[in-house]
A protein has these predicted regions:
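Catalytic loop of short-chain dehydrogenase/reductase
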Residues: 1-42, 54-58, 64-67
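C-terminal helical subdomain
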Residues: 43-53, 64-115
Length: 115
Protein backbone atom coordinates (compact mmCIF):
# COMPACT_ATOMS: atom_id res chain seq x y z
CA UNK A 1 0.00 0.00 0.00
CA UNK A 2 1.51 3.32 -1.07
CA UNK A 3 0.78 6.37 1.02
CA UNK A 4 2.29 9.69 2.00
CA UNK A 5 4.03 10.65 5.22
CA UNK A 6 1.41 13.38 5.52
CA UNK A 7 -1.31 10.69 5.55
CA UNK A 8 0.60 8.04 7.51
CA UNK A 9 1.35 10.50 10.33
CA UNK A 10 -1.91 12.51 10.14
CA UNK A 11 -2.90 11.58 13.71
CA UNK A 12 0.26 13.08 15.20
CA UNK A 13 1.39 15.72 12.69
CA UNK A 14 -0.94 18.26 11.07
CA UNK A 15 -0.70 18.72 7.32
CA UNK A 16 -1.64 21.50 4.92
CA UNK A 17 -5.37 22.21 5.12
CA UNK A 18 -5.62 21.63 1.36
CA UNK A 19 -4.34 18.07 1.80
CA UNK A 20 -6.06 17.10 5.05
CA UNK A 21 -9.15 15.43 3.48
CA UNK A 22 -6.89 13.35 1.24
CA UNK A 23 -4.59 12.46 4.15
CA UNK A 24 -7.49 11.36 6.33
CA UNK A 25 -8.92 9.22 3.53
CA UNK A 26 -5.56 7.59 2.78
CA UNK A 27 -5.01 6.89 6.49
CA UNK A 28 -8.44 5.26 6.72
CA UNK A 29 -7.47 2.99 3.82
CA UNK A 30 -4.16 2.15 5.48
CA UNK A 31 -5.91 1.31 8.75
CA UNK A 32 -8.48 -0.89 7.02
CA UNK A 33 -5.75 -2.84 5.27
CA UNK A 34 -3.64 -3.15 8.42
CA UNK A 35 -6.62 -4.78 10.14
CA UNK A 36 -6.37 -7.53 7.53
CA UNK A 37 -2.69 -8.33 8.15
CA UNK A 38 -3.34 -11.36 10.39
CA UNK A 39 -5.71 -12.90 7.85
CA UNK A 40 -3.36 -12.15 4.98
CA UNK A 41 -0.46 -13.70 6.90
CA UNK A 42 -2.50 -16.87 7.48
CA UNK A 43 -2.80 -17.14 3.71
CA UNK A 44 0.91 -16.54 3.17
CA UNK A 45 0.40 -13.01 1.85
CA UNK A 46 2.86 -10.34 2.95
CA UNK A 47 1.76 -6.74 3.36
CA UNK A 48 3.80 -3.56 3.61
CA UNK A 49 2.91 0.12 3.70
CA UNK A 50 5.33 2.27 1.71
CA UNK A 51 5.12 5.83 2.97
CA UNK A 52 6.85 8.64 1.13
CA UNK A 53 7.21 12.37 1.48
CA UNK A 54 5.96 14.81 -1.12
CA UNK A 55 6.98 13.34 -4.50
CA UNK A 56 8.26 15.87 -7.01
CA UNK A 57 6.61 15.56 -10.39
CA UNK A 58 3.28 14.18 -9.19
CA UNK A 59 -0.02 15.87 -9.84
CA UNK A 60 -0.67 15.99 -6.09
CA UNK A 61 2.51 17.97 -5.42
CA UNK A 62 1.75 20.24 -8.37
CA UNK A 63 -1.78 20.96 -7.16
CA UNK A 64 -0.59 21.57 -3.60
CA UNK A 65 2.01 23.98 -4.95
CA UNK A 66 -0.69 25.87 -6.85
CA UNK A 67 -2.90 26.06 -3.78
CA UNK A 68 -0.01 26.88 -1.46
CA UNK A 69 2.85 28.52 -3.44
CA UNK A 70 6.21 27.54 -2.03
CA UNK A 71 4.96 24.25 -0.55
CA UNK A 72 7.41 22.10 -2.52
CA UNK A 73 10.42 24.30 -1.77
CA UNK A 74 9.45 24.51 1.90
CA UNK A 75 9.12 20.74 2.22
CA UNK A 76 12.35 20.13 0.28
CA UNK A 77 14.20 22.50 2.61
CA UNK A 78 12.72 20.82 5.69
CA UNK A 79 13.38 17.26 4.46
CA UNK A 80 16.72 17.94 2.80
CA UNK A 81 15.59 16.01 -0.29
CA UNK A 82 12.38 15.08 -2.02
CA UNK A 83 12.20 11.98 -4.16
CA UNK A 84 11.06 12.23 -7.76
CA UNK A 85 8.63 9.74 -9.31
CA UNK A 86 11.34 7.38 -10.59
CA UNK A 87 13.22 7.35 -7.29
CA UNK A 88 10.09 6.64 -5.29
CA UNK A 89 8.97 3.97 -7.76
CA UNK A 90 12.30 2.21 -7.21
CA UNK A 91 11.67 2.23 -3.46
CA UNK A 92 8.20 0.74 -3.96
CA UNK A 93 9.71 -1.99 -6.15
CA UNK A 94 12.29 -2.76 -3.46
CA UNK A 95 9.52 -3.04 -0.88
CA UNK A 96 8.05 -5.85 -2.97
CA UNK A 97 11.22 -7.97 -2.84
CA UNK A 98 13.01 -7.03 0.39
CA UNK A 99 12.10 -8.46 3.81
CA UNK A 100 8.98 -6.92 5.33
CA UNK A 101 9.79 -4.70 8.34
CA UNK A 102 8.36 -5.93 11.65
CA UNK A 103 5.90 -3.02 11.74
CA UNK A 104 4.91 -3.61 8.09
CA UNK A 105 6.04 -0.07 7.23
CA UNK A 106 8.75 1.14 4.87
CA UNK A 107 9.41 4.86 5.31
CA UNK A 108 11.00 6.52 2.29
CA UNK A 109 12.73 9.83 2.88
CA UNK A 110 13.07 12.03 5.92
CA UNK A 111 10.50 11.66 8.70
CA UNK A 112 12.15 13.83 11.34
CA UNK A 113 9.38 16.44 11.19
CA UNK A 114 6.66 13.80 11.59
CA UNK A 115 5.75 12.24 14.90
Amino acid sequence: FVTSHQAHFIRTTPTMPEYEPVALSKRAGEDALRERIPGLAEQGIDFVVVSGDMIEGTITATLLERANPGAIADRRESAGKLYNVSEFAAEVALAAVEPIPSDNTRLVGDVSSFG
